[in-house]
Design a protein with these regions (language model features):
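Single conserved hydrophobic/aromatic residue that forms the stacking wall/gate
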Residues: 1-14
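A short LG(V/I)-centered, amphipathic sequence patch enriched
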Residues: 23-40
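Alpha-helical linker/hinge and terminal dimerization helices associated
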Residues: 25-26, 47-69
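Central regulatory/effector-binding core of bacterial HTH transcription factors
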Residues: 73-135, 205
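A late-sequence structural motif
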Residues: 88, 239-277
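Hydrophobic hinge/microswitch elements
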Residues: 111-124, 130, 184-241
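Flexible hinge/capping segments at coil-to-helix
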Residues: 138-175
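Secondary-structure junction motif
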Residues: 159-160, 174-195, 262-266, 270, ...
Length: 277
């Protein structure tokens, strides 16, 4: 389908004939033909989405059969959230790459909901993301590592360092948070609502990596994994603030489809991270 979509002029005649037959069998128009080429219709896009997932699994199976079990070649497709990558997965990837340099690592940056959807669609082997992560059978979730988040502010908030702020009091200061479509926003929105306060950030960041620079620029207070803020706090670039309430711990977790067969490389990497808990 993608070959035909990209073809131009009178080339790829046989592919076009095959697609014409498919359109007749389905009774659907899959392509809109113009002088400059062809484009997928809505029906064509829907068909392609299913074919793509099936082809991905077929190609993975072919790779596994060709490479055997020696782990000298192969590939792993991993969906990972930015926080999980920074505070957990990087060390595991480095160790695996040193042990199996012939394995091709495909790392996809996703939010937790996006990564879970990719596992469900069979587009990736598994996901390493942060909680909360909503999964339904046949997907499964394994907790890998807990972590805590802290409240930080720029140096202009140094006067608050000796105080204990409540969730309600935080509302009086500008807030920085990840976007509303993320599980991190939902996590803190639930906490704020439990204390009778609405989470209404003044600045919404696209990724966790953006939060620390925004705090340093004095745009507001923010919650961030302690490991990611440690150096900045130590160097007094930002201020760690105390909360009256204890925040729940969060977790880095592995999400996989128990019905989706993994190639030998993916099996080995999954085994390593699960056994290292």
């Amino acid at each position: 389908i993608r070959d035909v979509e990209r073809s131009r002029g009178l080339g790829d005649v046989y592919k076009r004939q095959a697609m014409n037959c498919l359109e007749q069998q389905l009774g659907r128009i899959l392509f809109v033909r113009t002088n400059r080429g062809v484009q997928l219709t809505r029906d064509g896009e829907q068909l392609y989405s299913y074919v793509e997932a099936a082809m991905s699994q077929l190609l993975t199976a072919e790779d596994e059969l060709a490479d055997g079990e020696n782990l000298t070649h192969g590939s792993i497709a991993i969906g990972v959230s930015e926080t999980a990558l920074n505070i957990y997965l990087l060390d595991k990837l480095r160790a695996f790459h040193m042990a199996y340099p012939g394995i091709n690592l495909k790392i996809y940056n996703h939010s937790t909901p996006q990564a879970v959807d990719e596992v469900k669609n069979g587009s990736i082997d598994f996901a390493v993301v942060t909680t909360p992560a909503d999964v339904e059978a046949p997907l499964k979730k394994i907790m890998l590592q807990s972590y805590r988040e802290i409240l930080i502010g720029g140096t202009t908030f140094f006067s608050l360092k000796k105080q204990k702020l409540s969730i309600a009091e935080i509302r009086n200061y500008p807030m920085i948070c990840l976007g509303r479509e993320t599980m991190t926003f939902r996590f803190y929105d639930r906490i704020f609502r439990e204390h009778g306060v609405e989470l209404a950030p003044d600045t919404e960041a696209a990724t966790t990596d953006q939060i620390l620079p925004l705090v340093k620029c004095e745009l507001g207070l923010a919650f961030i994994p302690e490991l990611m803020a440690r150096e900045a706090v130590k160097n007094k670039e930002v201020v760690k603030l105390s909360l009256e309430e204890k925040l729940p711990d969060r977790n880095v977790c592995l999400v996989y489809d128990c019905l989706h067969p993994l190639n030998e490389a993916a099996k080995q990497f999954k085994k390593i991270i699960v056994e290292s808990r």
